[in-house]
Amino acid sequence: MFVDQVKIYVKGGDGGNGMVAFRREKYVPKGGPAGGDGGKGGDVVFVVDEGLRTLMDFRYQRHFKAPRGENGMSKNQHGKNAEDLLVKVPPGTVVIDADTNEVLADLTEQGQRFVVAKGGRGGRGNTRFATAANPAPEIAENGEPGEERNVILELKLLADVGLVGFPSVGKSTLLSVVSAARPKIAEYHFTTLVPNLGVVETEDGRSFVMADLPGLIEGAHEGVGLGHQFLRHIERTRVIVHVIDMAAVEGRDPYDDYVVINEELKQYNLRLTERPQIVAANKMDMPNAEENLRRFKEKVGEAVPVFPISAATRQGVRELLFAIADLLETTPEFPLHELEEPAVQRVVYKYEKEELPFTITRGSDGAFILSGEKIEKLFKMTDFSREESVRRFARQLRAMGVDDALRERGAKDGDTVRLLDYEFEFVDDWDER
């Protein structure tokens, strides 16, 4: 199973409810309103943690909901703001909105933060609604609902070196002998189904991260075999080590393997061919390997460095690691996308259609159905247990043009109007006093 792409649900905490209260102290005549505001709901925040290397943790928990703010209290005491919910993600995580496919964030650096779902503000207490005309209001708001969304987390592996090659050429064996990683190794294709990471340290103290990536086959750029899941991981590697079975155990020609794999990399992303590549001619301890190596070198020439090794016996591995470390010192990180002129700063202005505050549809039972983010939020923040709050909500709907829109749609006195799970009766001659 690939855990490098996972869909999760996040929701910011709701704001705390405002309070309706009045001062009732012995020596304070006409004390007035004293209801405090609710506290802000917590945000859901992604935080990069270098200690994480996979998205495996999200396999077991896919819903993240921040705590809600504390409700307001009497004596004008405001509710406490809720703590943010911190969700740790590995470096290299790309956050994508599941509904719009918009890339929201690319998290690469230790400690980097991204607020993926904001908490709602606290509802106002009745002190906030006092006016000269109404000095003792019995109105308070419920807390604002927190943002909620479905997001896709995609992990593009942050490895310095990627091992590529056909299945069963010895990539996992090589990683296991040069690092403390213990990948699954067996005599069948696609033993490696997920990338394995290992930290390699050379004898002179240099270190780098090496990734044993799932095996490629012809047609991988079109999704054949492990296809796209493999190629997604290699995009950020700085150096490619091409492991080739020089003994031709599977019956394939080593040079043909080399050509096919490089063509797959080129077809998937042209920029992959710009990365420096080293050939690790593996299984040199087996028959026919020396003759195959000689013919291979004749065909590739001097353009590509070739290191004969045997991962099983560790022959030539030391020299290979030194060559990789030397190459990394002179190889910068590669951009994933096309280069732009560094001196030019561009600002992109996007046209965003103004969202209507509400829409009206008809239900199968003839009821008028109100919907829309703005009107639904207004509804959720209204305390319908208090008459003044209900009247205020009705005034707000009238100001938004809901009454006129319902009349245009043919609503008559006594018709049913539905908003979320609640039903109202349309009153054509409503008196707002």
From Swiss-Prot:
GO terms of molecular function: GTP binding; GTPase activity; magnesium ion binding
Protein name, entry field: GTPase Obg
GO cellular component, one term: cytoplasm
GO biological process: ribosome biogenesis
Lineage: Bacteria, Bacillati, Bacillota, Bacilli, Bacillales
Family, per entry: Belongs to the TRAFAC class OBG-HflX-like GTPase superfamily. OBG GTPase family.
Gene3D superfamilies in the cross-refs: GTP-binding protein OBG, C-terminal domain, GTP1/OBG domain, P-loop containing nucleotide triphosphate hydrolases
Transcription is among the record's keywords: no
Keywords, ordered alphabetically: Cytoplasm, GTP-binding, Hydrolase, Magnesium, Metal-binding, Nucleotide-binding
Boundaries of every Obg domain copy: 1-158
Entry function: An essential GTPase which binds GTP, GDP and possibly (p)ppGpp with moderate affinity, with high nucleotide exchange rates and a fairly low GTP hydrolysis rate. Plays a role in control of the cell cycle, stress response, ribosome biogenesis and in those bacteria that undergo differentiation, in morphogenesis control.
Binding site for GTP: 165-172, 190-194, 212-215, 282-285, 310-312
Residue ranges constituting the OCT domain according to the UniProt record: 350-428
Protein origin, superkingdom: Bacteria
